[in-house]
Amino acid sequence: KEGFKVYDSFVDVNKKMYDAQVQELDFASPTAKDVINQWCAEQTNNCIKEVIQRIPEDARMYLINALYFKGIWKSQFQKSDTRQENFTNSDGTEQKVNMMNQTETFNYAQNSAFSIAELPYGNEAFSMVLLLPAVDKTLDESLSELTYENWKEWNTALSGRQLQVKLPRFKVEYNKMLIEDMVAMGMKDAFDGYKADFSKMSAAELYIGLLQQFTYVNVDEEGTEAAAVTVGGMFETSVGPSTPISFYVDRPFAFVIKEKSTGAILFMGKITKL
C-alpha cells in the first residue's frame, strides 16, 4: 500500500533471493485491483486474469507468486486420431469426451496402487506423469499410498514400454483458499492478528488475512499449458513388448507435471469428473 513502511532489509532479501518486484500502489484507488490483476494476466499468458475482486480497507500488502508453463509433447497426439469416447466419472456417470489416442514408447510402471505412464515434453526436461488407479481401487484409495518414499520408488521403477495411450483432453480452472490447510499443517500463528509476528518485515502489527491459489491446466493433442498464481494478503490488526500395453485414461486419474533433473513438482492434481 502506498505510504506503508516495509523494512528495506525485507525488500532487499526478496529481490535478491526471489527476483521479486516491489511496487507501491494506492489501495484506495478504484483501479488498484486492476493493476494487480493485469500483472497476473501478463505473467500467466492470460490464463489467469482475475485474482483480486476488491481490496479491503485493512489490507497493507499483497505477496503474489505466478507460475506459467507451456509444454509441447515430445510425441504429439494426432487430432485425426481423437474420438468421442466415454469417461466414467467418480460418481459412476458417463460423459462423452474427446479422447486422444497414440501408440508410442513411454516410461511405464505398475504397482498395487497405480498404472503409471510418463509423457515427456520437448527435449524431455519436463514431463507429465499420469497415475491411473488399479481397477479394484478408487482414485482416493490409490492416492492414500502416494507417500514421498513411494513416489520416489515408483519413479525409479519406470522403464520404456510400448503403450497405447488414450487420454482425454481436459482443462482445469480452480481456485482454493489455503488458510485452513496451512493451519491443519501446523502454521497457525501467522493467520492470527494477536499472535502473528512479522516484526522483521514491518513495525506494523501484521497478519496474513488471505492465502489463495488459482490454477489453470489445459491438456490437448499439442501439449500442456498450465499456470498458477498464489496470492497472500497481509492485513493490519484493529502454500516394451511387441503388443502395446493398454493405458486407457477413461476414469478418474491423477497427474503430475515435473522437472526431470531435480524431480521438482510444478503442478499436480486429480481429475474426477469431465
Regions found by a protein language model. Give the residues of each.
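Extended hydrophobic
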Residues: 63, 115-131, 240-274
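Composition- and surface-driven signal marking solvent-exposed, interaction-prone regions
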Residues: 76-78, 131, 141-146, 231-232, ...
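Short, charged/polar low-complexity linear motifs in solvent-exposed/disordered segments
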Residues: 82, 145-146, 244
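Internal alpha/beta scaffold segment
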Residues: 133-159
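Extracytoplasmic/secreted cell-surface and envelope-processing proteins
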Residues: 138-140, 174-176, 227, 264-267
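Non-catalytic, conformational "gating/processing" segments within enzyme and secreted inhibitor domains
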Residues: 1-134, 156-239
